[in-house]
Amino acid sequence: MSRMYDRSEQLFAEAKTLIPGGVNSPVRAFKSVGRNPVFIERAEGAYLYDVDGNKYVDYVGSWGPMIVGHAHPEVSEALKAAIDRGTSYGAPTELESRLAKLILEAFPAMDMVRMVNSGTEATMSALRLARGYTGRSKIVKFEGCYHGHADSLLIKAGSGALTLGVPTSPGVPANIANNTITAPYNDLETLKAIFQEAGDDIAAIIIEGVPGNMGVVPPAPGYLQGVRELTRQYGALMIVDEVMSGFRVDFGGAQTLYGVEPDLTCLGKIIGGGLPVGAYGGKAEIMEKVSPAGPIYQAGTLSGNPLAMTAGIITLEILKRPGTYAALDEKAAYLADGLAKAAEKAGVPVWTNRVGSMLTGFFTDRPVVDFASACTSDTAAFGTYFRAMLDRGVYLACSQFEAAFLSLAMTKEDLDFTIAAAEEAFQVVAAERAKA
């Protein structure tokens, strides 16, 4: 292809001398797709523009937040006015209550919400609250579900449901890992066995509303309800991590879509309209344990800052408009169907999972229902596909195990452009496989 990436290559070489790995979040380095990253100069609507002048249809959307599109005029106008009033006060503002009201309106399971600065802060704080509220220490998480980089959540399972957790990163102490039990996702029977053995010690289950960091893997019918029943039976809390799915798959997130009421909910991404933000909330009797109302400490210098609150308010007000989610779902269904047909035409096996406007095409010929089945994907083939799509002006998540996100800014022309690019990219994959 005729695209050039010289300036991106220069900037990445420089960045590696200044920043670990040249990036401030590991996935951005493009390591798993066999090339160096492109450096972005600006974004508008459905598009990214890199420093070499290349334009891309963007399906990363800053890893989910940009659901209304980049530099949306209403969001940008409100932010410019907010900047002129000062960027941070370290004091309460009406904006915090306005955003809180919008969130509580969308999530009936929440009576109160606390703003923080990231999804990691939200999940970390929710776990501390769950432990403080229940007086228990252990938590259960699920294979393939990602909840940020807090120590107790960077854990993988050993061989067997109740094997002591093993850290997946150096620097996570064993005594912290020992309090995290990892279970297979979408497997209610194994979860029941875990609770039968350790239920009296479990403070909480934390689960993604729609897992997106092993690729998109929907919960099986009745699975979330089964998890909810187990936690109630044993007096543990159910924490639903909706950092990715909140306001994405439905205005009320996955819990509204699937009809489940958790004790605590974690949010992020979309509620900041592209600015750093997080939140956690739940029933008043639990949330009133958070300081200064209660004894469980949590704080943040920039929590509830006026810029993130402003962007979040405008974004959620846009999303509340009639027909928003029907339009997103229609676009995503059209794209998923077109991509599936393109893969079939090229003879490349791809299994597509989609929930609302988030989807993943797994390079495998079997259904993907959990982490183990996601891992049957041909990651080398995905890398070939990713590079071919990038060269054709389509910016995808640079990992097989991530979601593609659609935005309201995308047009049918953008989707058709993407499908046409995919038809060529799948042919490249097929040709590479034929050589092997």
From Swiss-Prot:
UniProt similarity note: Belongs to the class-III pyridoxal-phosphate-dependent aminotransferase family. HemL subfamily.
Annotated pathway: Porphyrin-containing compound metabolism; protoporphyrin-IX biosynthesis; 5-aminolevulinate from L-glutamyl-tRNA(Glu): step 2/2; Porphyrin-containing compound metabolism; chlorophyll biosynthesis
Span of the signal peptide: none
Cytoplasm keyword on record: yes
Name this polypeptide is given: Glutamate-1-semialdehyde 2,1-aminomutase
Gene3D superfamilies xrefs: Aspartate Aminotransferase, domain 1, Type I PLP-dependent aspartate aminotransferase-like (Major domain)
UniProt record, GO biological process: chlorophyll biosynthetic process; protoporphyrinogen IX biosynthetic process
Cofactor(s) needed by this chain: pyridoxal 5'-phosphate
Cellular component GO terms, alphabetical: cytoplasm
UniProt-annotated location(s): Cytoplasm
Statement: the UniProt record of this protein carries the keyword Cell wall biogenesis/degradation: no
Native organism taxonomy: Bacteria, Bacillati, Bacillota, Clostridia, Eubacteriales
Alphabetical list of InterPro entries matching this protein: 4pyrrol_synth_GluAld_NH2Trfase, Aminotrans_3, Aminotrans_3_PPA_site, PyrdxlP-dep_Trfase, PyrdxlP-dep_Trfase_major, PyrdxlP-dep_Trfase_small
Quaternary state and interactors: Homodimer.
Primary localisation category: cytoplasm
Reaction(s) catalysed (UniProt annotation): (S)-4-amino-5-oxopentanoate = 5-aminolevulinate
Modified residues (N6-(pyridoxal phosphate)lysine): K269
Stored CDD domains: OAT_like
Keyword terms of this UniProt record: Chlorophyll biosynthesis, Cytoplasm, Isomerase, Porphyrin biosynthesis, Pyridoxal phosphate
